[in-house]
Amino acid sequence: MHISRTMTPVQDLPVETVERKGFGHPDTLADGIAEAVSLAFSRACLDGAPGAVLHHNVDKVYIGAGHITRRYGAHELLKPAVVRINGRMSASFAGEDLGIERIQTEAAERYLSVFAPHYRVGESIVIEPNATQHTNRPDWFTPKSLDDVPDAKDPRASDTALCVAHAPASPTEHVVRELEYALWDWSGDTPRPRFCDVGQDVKVFGWREGRTLDVTACVPLLSDSVASHDAYQERIRHLESELQGIADTLADGRLDVRTRVNPTTSGEGYREYMLALGSCIECGEEGVVGRGNALNGLINPLRPRSMESPFGKNPAYHTGKVYGHLAQQLADDVHARFGVACSVWLTSPNGFPLLPPRNVWIELAPGEGPGDRELTDFVQERMAAFQVPGDLLVQRFRR
């Protein structure tokens, strides 16, 4: 394990920029559906005859190709959007069919019911399961027994991948992420849209210079709920005032925040941000896994980012998923235990034992944190307590 004290906390930089693609953004939907399918398949394997997570990766989910026209108070569906679940997935175990098309379809439908609640499967959106078993490794995706799933007993790094995580979130990151979360009601078992007239394809962008944070939030109104241009502008002004108050509370005096919602309200080229069903997949936009938020729910170009997107990858052994979650857990734990900002870097060569990672780098700010021996003992203890895949089989809605 390597420990250095050379990190400059991102909040100490003179300029910081952060973006979040909201839950209804096409890329975020693709990430979420891929993850939901992987977790549903993993749970089915653990609860059923295999008793272990079988080989799969569904990290190439594609969404798009819909077409809906909109006008004040109405819309017309011309072509449904499509969710194509691309990847590979074990189709049988010991000769018994696992029903993977049903698992894929039901998992995607459940996820869409939460984060794209205005879409109706089979009507405005179509789900196309498409996981194959093509490979040059015999019985890899059609195992006759767990002897054909060697990683069930001896998990090895499936790839040479670098994963990095950071804690805590900077004030800018906190405001940008939580501002989109504020558009959801988190009081139940699953989140629900807070406003019945607001769509889910939201993007929040923050630009900080010194203590001044400018936030631009692109928030769609549902066209059926908008009676006129004047009604649109009035609702946007109301949303802007409400989100400004939330942003001020989130900043808690650490930043001076200016929040703007759909700021272009007049002039040549003006275009209202209205959607019929809440996501731009309805008008030709496309979503693909790995093009959006990192595991922490943000896009921050000033922080190093993992080389792998974890969404849809096997939670039992895929390096880019396991190390992504482990790095974030370690960063959170170090910050909680010692009260310092830190970055955690993890990697292992392909084929090496998965846990513990062969290479661990903990980076702290100069002059901060515990001694090297105390930090090493703590990190090794936390790594030993990490369970694969158990710690990863949780639907992390707020990520």
What are these regions (language model features)?
Residues 18-20, 81-88, 213-226, 307-313, ...:
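Short, hydrophobic beta-strand segments
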Residues 1-53:
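N-terminal, positively charged regions that mediate nucleic acid binding
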Residues 237-304, 313-336:
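Long, well-ordered mid-to-C-terminal structural blocks that present hydrophobic/aromatic surfaces
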Residues 106-247, 251-252, 257-265:
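Glycine-rich, mobile lid/loop segments that gate access to catalytic sites or pores
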Residues 335-399:
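Internal helix-turn-beta structural module
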Residues 1-18, 142-156, 210-219, 292-306:
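N-terminal, Lys/Arg- and Ser/Thr-rich interaction peptides
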Residues 43, 47-122:
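Glycine-rich, N-terminal phosphate-binding loop and its surrounding beta-alpha-beta segment
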Residues 77, 209-213, 267-271, 353-359:
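A short, glycine/Asx- and small/polar-enriched loop/turn
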